[in-house]
Amino acid sequence: MLRHRDTARQRYAAPFVNALNALARPVFGGDVDFQLSEELQVETRSHDGQTIDFGDLSGGAKEQLGILTRFAIAQLVAGGGAPVVIDDALGSTDATRLQLMSTLFDRVGRQAQVIVFTCMPGRFSRVPGRTELSMKKLKSV
């Protein structure tokens, strides 16, 4: 049983880390790398020769990594086409990373549907090609 578990983990771990690393490069830098736990959860982030435990990352970095993780899983599950729902995120993200994340939202949104619920639409105002719908508009549909 353990052998089958380990085989399944290996089958999913490498593609997940590869997708996560590719998505994270524009946000965290070109040499970013993540290490996973046995449960396929991010344990550490390495960048510029420094490795940081997940728990020691800033709130903004954790929030960004949570979104990147969803994007990576969506790419793997449906070959890039699974919808991703984001609920009022990026509140702890600085302006520079917010711009980088906006570019990433656009890139992912070209391959899959990305739905963002927010009470702060300004956080996502830099996402090219976005469609904004107010709650009033959504209720009338």
Kindly label every feature range from the protein language model.
Residues A22, T96-V141:
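C-terminal lobe/lid and adjacent interdomain/linker elements of RecA-like ASCE P-loop ATPase modules
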